């Protein structure tokens, strides 16, 4: 395809949702190096995706819109939506592509942009677009969007998300790194917005103590709302740990994760961010979620999997058509990785921290991070 000046990409949701699209966005950048890539996203995208961090050149915030940008405390404004679409039509996009759902909501959105070519995912009941592939839920999210990018001949050799940690991110955590005095540290990210993806908080204190006994400093990460919960975990430890919850920006968090020798987390945004800065990870996954959200490589990433399928409250096996569905009268609000043992997580961590061949990989990565030149 020639003379492509502007490509709009719709992905207006959360951190992990965006990060898994990065290989596809990189494919678009590689294939169309002179094209402006514009993300139609949320306010956090505009704050985080500053110049140089990803292949995205510009972010335009999408107004609150059912099925596109859902906000708990936000309401739709039809006048704002109309003004948005008029503005987007004046952009004269050559291609509008969506990486968001099965097309029921996203396809009508794309068509209102009046782009020369519309591309994305679709299902039988969705509004038609120019080029599409069928949406089937159970698929690696990374590979899903690479398939979509392939509809405009975009290709890449990179199948793991990648972002750049910038100088301003390094500067933000300089005091923390000075305090640690170059001691190797492991990051634990214990909580998740969706409790069903979170490991039992009580497991983190003994895990953190084990890491301390092995010679690693321990940093906990999370949102400001999770700070108290992390304080409670630390209060049950025999050793000291650092609570960074709510104390850094998303860029600062990326810098912390990049400097860690290992990140241990449930299936949530910071785990995907750690992958994107090339830090070894131990991720705790419910088996159905691993299909979509797990890493594609294993050299420095180890998933620990829960195979416990049934909800203990109602007995339903909630994995069809999506994870945690159907709900009926039960929302299955309990951890679905609760049966993962501390021993299993330790074994996965040991495989990355202490085996000689993995240690060499860690040392190479570690020496190239913010510590040093």
Identify the role of each PLM range:
Residues 1-373:
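Catalytic machinery of carbohydrate-active enzymes
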